[in-house]
From Swiss-Prot:
Pfam families: Amidase_5, Choline_bind_1, Choline_bind_3
Residue spans of the Cell wall-binding repeats: 152-171, 173-194, 196-216, 217-236, 237-256, 259-278
Protein name in UniProt: Lysin
UniProt GO MF annotations: cysteine-type peptidase activity; N-acetylmuramoyl-L-alanine amidase activity
Signal peptide residue numbers: none
E.C. no: 3.5.1.28
Function comment: Lysis of bacterial host cell wall.
This protein's GO CC annotations: host cell wall
Family: Belongs to the peptidase C40 family.
Higher taxonomy: Viruses, Duplodnaviria, Heunggongvirae, Uroviricota, Caudoviricetes
UniProt KW Protease keyword: yes
Length: 296
């Protein structure tokens, strides 16, 4: 089954002035954004399923899978009905950073956009100038009978980093994800890339650490020259911690474990041993020069 451009145009025309624009509720039937409207229009025209309504970042590869060819990259071209434009450089076009739509003739485009709160027909160059003349790509259908290659699932890697493709073709983005094959939680940033060897302060107010392989830290973890303790859900612990039969103290601000030192907590002083354990009934001696020594 190939892509029929006229069916795609008809899908958009049928919804012109009848749907609203929304990046939060982009899967219809009452609202779409620029990329989801293009996705569903081309799906109605015979394009293959990606498992989700691809955004402008992932639309490039999806178009090529469905028989489109990149015919212009930020260079003049003679537009034809059915050409699809994508504004915004790859890697920086997701969300409000990009835009896409379809040409219905050499000058005009049909697109779902914020300015008209829905699907409208406009002069391409006017809208492009109004948007600040963004970097652009143009794709044209050259093989209407293209059969998309088998989708790659699981862990994927490119020059930027790792991401994870789910069985339904979607990918985690700006969220935690439990990967069964790794038996661990991971976190993926707003571009879908795995965090590695990084701290994350989440919107829940907690701090999390992900090691060089992206695994979320739990229990004790040495990071740099300090030790930290993380709950089973990965959140960093501060204050007193009872671990088996011993007590430890992690800084209330930074979370690093204190050791070989006195700490003041509430109205008392506590002695922590070199390995961080709270000393059990230490004996103190005040030397003639005022130095306090401890016997543990």
């Amino acid at each position: 089954m190939g892509v029929d451009i006229e069916k795609g145009v008809a899908w958009m025309q049928a919804r012109k002035g009848r749907v609203s624009y929304s990046m939060d509720f982009r899967d219809g039937p009452d609202s779409y954004d620029c990329s989801s409207s293009m996705y569903y229009a081309l799906r109605s025209a015979g394009a293959s399923s990606a498992g989700w309504a691809v955004n402008t970042e992932y639309m490039h590869a999806w178009l090529i899978e469905n028989g489109y060819e990149l015919i212009s990259e930020n260079a003049p071209w003679d537009a034809k009905r059915g050409d699809i434009f994508i504004w915004g450089r790859k890697g920086a076009s997701a969300g409000a950073g990009g835009h896409t739509g379809m040409f219905i003739d050499s000058d005009n485009i049909i697109h779902c956009n914020y300015a008209y709160d829905g699907i409208s027909v406009n002069d391409h160059d006017e809208r492009w100038y109004y948007a600040g003349q963004p970097y652009y790509y143009v794709y044209r259908l050259t093989n209407a009978n293209a059969q998309p290659a088998e989708k790659k699932l699981g862990w994927q890697k490119d020059a930027t980093g790792f991401w994870y493709a789910r069985a339904n073709g979607t990918y985690p983005k700006d969220e935690f994800e439990y990967i069964e094959e790794n038996k661990s939680w991971f976190y993926f940033d707003d571009q879908g890339y795995m965090l590695a060897e990084k701290w994350l302060k989440h919107t829940d107010g907690n701090w999390y650490w992900f090691d060089r392989d992206g695994y979320m830290a739990t229990s004790w973890k040495r990071i740099g020259e300090s030790w930290y303790y993380f709950n089973r859900d990965g959140s960093m612990v501060t204050g007193w911690i009872k671990y088996y039969d011993n007590w430890y103290y992690c800084d209330a601000t930074n979370g690093d474990m204190k050791s070989n030192a006195f700490i003041r907590y509430n109205d008392g002083w506590y002695l922590l041993l070199p390995d961080g354990r709270l000393a059990d009934k230490p004996q103190f001696t005040v030397e003639p020069d005022g130095l306090i020594t401890a016997k543990v």
